[in-house]
Amino acid sequence: MSKSLNNLQPWGAFFLRLVLGVAMIYNGYDKVIPHGGFHGNAFSALDHHSHYVASLGLPYWLGYVSALAEFIGGILILLGLLTRFAAFLIACNMLVAIAMVTRHHGYSGSEYALALFVIALMLLFYGAGACALDRKIGFA
């Protein structure tokens, strides 16, 4: 039985990629794309998120990095492109989310960020798995 499960291992990483990629794109979308489209200031959503990050005592520019890591990192994870790099960025982002954001609530609600952190670590350590562009270009 373990041999047949080992054959399915690349597909486990594929499904983790799907979950993490969709979650990160969903979470990052509102931080990158302004509500109502790009009328006026294209950076208004990023600025809003950066102000929130700065209110936590972190550098303002880290808000830009955080939002782009979520949105673009989610796209990369979903495609299986530069998976380990994107997983590293997302893992760092989730670690900051657990440490800085959820601490104001007694860490209540940190389970979601913790689960995404663990999925990102799995992809960082084990790679993209099946159906990944990394395999096609030799990054696997």
Q: Where in the sequence are the language-model features?
A:
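Extended, low-polarity transmembrane helix blocks
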Residues: 1-38, 51-54, 60-68, 72, ...
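Extracytoplasmic catalytic/substrate-binding loops of multi-pass membrane glycan-assembly enzymes
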Residues: 41-44
